[in-house]
């Protein structure tokens, strides 16, 4: 795993979180993740596309074609109510796991 790879198993959650802020196209999601992580995470375009397809198939996001900011057709993704619920579950689970790892790392030998 490269230093900038998204942590395995978190891409769907990061996509859902990005879309919870506003509907956006794939490049916008990539930029959002890289911007908020301050460049720590880079998103592979192929992985992102597979993530969108998986989330749409599961009913967690919707997609529609629109004109982008630069007047080009782009597929915009938005969070469904089911997606919002899943994001909450994923976020709670992730925070629980991070707290457990922090406790393990801080434990005295």
Regions found by a protein language model. Give the residues of each.
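Accessory beta->alpha helical hairpin/"wing" motif in late/C-terminal subdomains of nucleic-acid enzymes
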Residues: 79-83
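Amphipathic alpha-helical dimerization/coiled-coil segments
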Residues: 85-109
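Beta-hairpin "wing" of winged helix-turn-helix
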Residues: 56-73, 78
């Amino acid at each position: 795993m490269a230093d900038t790879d998204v942590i395995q198993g978190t891409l769907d959650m990061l996509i859902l979180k990005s879309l919870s802020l506003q509907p956006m196209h794939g490049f916008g999601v990539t930029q959002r993740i890289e911007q908020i992580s301050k460049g720590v995470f880079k998103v592979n375009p192929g992985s992102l596309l597979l993530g969108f397809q998986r989330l749409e198939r599961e009913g967690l996001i919707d997609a529609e074609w629109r004109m982008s900011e630069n007047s080009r057709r782009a597929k915009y993704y938005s969070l469904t109510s089911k997606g919002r619920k899943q994001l909450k579950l994923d976020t709670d689970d992730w925070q629980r796991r991070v707290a457990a790892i922090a406790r393990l790392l801080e434990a005295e030998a």
